């Protein structure tokens, strides 16, 4: 079965390139007075809080979920059709560079309220689940309307060792052109190595009211994915009198613990065709995290942040992938764990460095 890619390469490239161009313009064109800033210094501790506004791009297995009984080979509604709303969340990081530029940091990331829905209708009442025999056995048949919902949330914790390299700040003789700019205040590169845990909780429901019934027959699935990753990354920062620019990239190879459960409710029968089932398995996956941010420096400690993010989880179990439309009462126990989730969107927050 084909996997629908989360985003085209051109869209991903554009999403990163646009904020980068804005930052380049800001560096070249903005030279604001900053008499209250002390000049070149290498802060030793930092705390960051960002509000997140991220949209999930579904990468479910591309397959029919709802068809018409008059054309059962053509999808009326596909598993990957619903488009998610923008989820809100938070990211918090605290760290210290230590005495010898060998430090640590801890962080949390959470994204909530990612909701997707898609509804279809047919005045002839021919809508049914993808397999006609399964549809007859479960009451997912003869629908004038059908809808699918998908809800998910992500939580992540990480702890990293940090190796810090500071460039010394303004230097008229430096071979780096940005260090020769009069209003340059200092830059650094951090090398990160650590551990990251991420949890994806995903639910999906298919509903079809059979015939004239006002109560829908439903097929619900829940999937949980825990990723335990060894993580490497790098973070760079350039600070000027009033503006600073920061970007990072982190990637972790993860072992995964996956589980799923599902249940059917037949509006036409009190005896379920298939009892609730569940299963679990282990596998491998990946966590990738990228950010590009601009910071307006309020004073020597505080700054306002705005930026753009890309987050990618692979090797996860997606709820819609767990639906088993086979006409087998013992079905619904196989776990599909090859899904991926791609998030992109903005961050807005506050930082302190001292």
Name these PLM-found stretches.
Residues 53, 160-161, 340-354:
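Outer-membrane beta-barrel "beta-signal"
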Residues 43-45, 100-104, 155, 185-191, ...:
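Outer-envelope beta-barrel architecture signal
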Residues 53-57, 110-114, 165, 195-201, ...:
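Transmembrane beta-strands of outer-membrane beta-barrel pores
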Residues 31-110:
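Short glycine/proline- and aromatic-enriched beta-strand/turn motifs that initiate or cap beta-hairpins
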Residues 78-120, 156-158, 188-190, 196-199, ...:
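Glycine- and aromatic-enriched membrane insertion/assembly motifs of diderm outer-membrane
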